[in-house]
């Protein structure tokens, strides 16, 4: 059976055979090589030129040439042998410690002792200049120092934010309770957990109201911040005793206009039984005042028990000498059970601190 010859084995006549005598190999003799990704073709490298400064030729010195060292000074000449002696005497010392010891010893030498080493250093300098007339000092490039790790500034920002927030709270607190001319923080009279809010009041100092405000039912806070706490409690006493001496219409006006200090220690207008006396509640906000405005007298009076306050608010009808208004009864501090609220304990302490309430008549 005859097989046809494959096409790649045939010799096709080319038109350049008669013109050019160059022999062209047949197509089947040239092996077809496909480029593999593992062996990429090497790029053509430029041929090095004998002229310096071109291509890959070194421009300063040949790699094989040794580096020319600087001539030694007088200290180096003296320390060359002295370092060996110290290293033999103290083999456990570090090289840096030896260098410090050598430097201190060189400073302690006199000029006469340094003279031979200075002369030897000058001789070496002249010899070095003769051996290398074209020598130029080229310091080695220093190694790049390791970059210092950047400290995360988030704790600092948090601390600064906390400090700024504390200062903002202080400024808000200063706006709510202006001082009587003192700018120190001590004059705020802020109670600590170890003291009661009533401890900042001096019992010997009497309460004072202007003459034009004695006849009014609601005297304004005519005191500094330290007396603002007491005035808030006096306000509570007057509000409790109002049903016996004033009409409900006046009472509604009192309940709708609480003082800022009373709101500071009791922002919700109720009994602060859940908050210790030594701790301060957050500063008052506008929503608390608006919520207090919407409450009626009946809702507020529902939280009070008149029978409980009658045993603490027995005020005398007699007037003290020198005071044009009734004076509260001076009595010994009473022991209050633990089950009662902290508001009752605060009012019992207030009754012993010479608070004067002109509105209470019975």
Curated annotation (Swiss-Prot):
Compartments, as annotated in UniProt: Nucleus
Sequence ranges assigned to domain Sox C-terminal in this UniProt record: 235-361
Principal localisation: nucleus
Listed GO CC annotations: nucleus
Compositional bias (Basic residues): 135-149
SMART domains: HMG
Region (Important for transcriptional activation): 149-209
Protein name: Transcription factor Sox-18
Residues in the DNA-binding region annotation: 68-136
Bias (Basic and acidic residues): 1-13, 59-68
UniProt KW keywords: Developmental protein, DNA-binding, Nucleus, Transcription, Transcription regulation
GO BP term, example: heart development
Gene3D superfamilies on file: High mobility group box domain
UniProt-annotated stretches for the region Disordered: 1-68, 129-159
Domain of life: Eukaryota
Entry-linked InterPro entries: HMG_box_dom, HMG_box_dom_sf, Sox7/17/18_central, Sox_C, SRY-related_HMG-box_TF-like
